């Protein structure tokens, strides 16, 4: 009788071991990339060096990165500087920027800007940032190689702000055939209409920012004037539950909106108000 019990125990242990080996282990190594935009007038003469940083090197992100990282436990964060001079933006010159800011202060009624906000695309400036983003993407691939991280195990999520949007597209171009992509969070993209990509590469694509050029928009004086907001190309085709545009809530206090405040991350507290179940809320999933 004891021999039969022992045989049964050994049989079960053997089969459980084999069954355990048959269950595929998740070997995915996930990385969350933060890409900042222009760092302000004091840095206007500078251009990115395309280096990888393991911490926010300039304090650009305030509490935004901390909030996002809490929803991505165990994920490795890396940072790239997408800063470029104003001449690569839709403003083209600091004078144009100042003029737009001045006249926007008097637009308390009109919701559509024909000339006050600098909305004319700057394709050359945008492409320069894309090109530098490609260099950064190659640098990230080198980082993976140096740390013996198999590319078929890598999954990348991206968070970009302002000028960082163009830079992120360049990084995507450099890596799209080599790694997987998860979520793409686009915060107040600058020159957003210039280029898009095939968003099917991503699990989710969300664009956050000010609303403009429709009946539900705020008056011009409360809109994002640093990067007048339009949809990134193709986001309207992303499934409703997987992406789209998320606007500053219409109930958000006017004192917290404006040419600068509707763009700057220091005033992005409304982003933290997006709760589980709300459209645009995100967290680590597959």
Say what each PLM segment does.
Residues 5-15:
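Sec-dependent N-terminal signal peptides
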Residues 13-14, 107, 160, 221:
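Generic recognition of cysteine residues
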């Amino acid at each position: 009788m004891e021999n039969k019990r022992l045989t049964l125990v050994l049989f079960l242990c053997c089969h459980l071991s084999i069954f355990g080996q048959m269950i595929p282990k998740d070997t995915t190594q996930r990385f969350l990339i933060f890409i900042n935009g222009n760092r302000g007038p004091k840095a206007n003469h500078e251009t990115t060096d395309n280096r990888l940083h393991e911490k926010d090197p300039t304090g650009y992100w305030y509490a935004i990165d901390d909030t996002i990282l809490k929803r991505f436990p165990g994920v490795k964060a890396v940072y790239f500087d997408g800063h470029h001079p104003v001449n690569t933006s839709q403003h083209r010159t600091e004078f144009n920027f100042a003029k737009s800011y001045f006249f926007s202060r008097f637009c308390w009624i009109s919701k559509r800007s024909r000339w006050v906000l600098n909305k004319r695309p700057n394709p050359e400036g945008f492409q320069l940032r894309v090109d530098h983003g490609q260099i950064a993407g190659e640098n990230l691939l080198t980082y993976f190689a140096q740390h013996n991280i198999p590319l078929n195990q890598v999954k990348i999520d991206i968070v970009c702000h302002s000028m960082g949007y163009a830079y992120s597209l360049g990084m995507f171009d450099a890596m799209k055939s080599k790694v997987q992509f998860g979520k793409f969070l686009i915060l107040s993209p600058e020159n957003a209409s210039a280029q898009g990509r095939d968003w099917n590469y991503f699990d989710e694509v969300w664009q956050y920012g000010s609303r403009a050029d429709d009946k539900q928009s705020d008056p011009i004086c409360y809109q994002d004037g640093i990067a007048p907001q339009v949809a990134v190309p193709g986001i309207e085709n992303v499934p409703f539950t997987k992406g789209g545009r998320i606007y500053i809530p219409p109930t958000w206090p006017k004192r917290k909106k404006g040419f600068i405040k509707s763009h700057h991350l220091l005033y992005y507290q409304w982003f933290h108000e997006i709760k589980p179940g709300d459209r645009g809320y995100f967290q680590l999933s597959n």
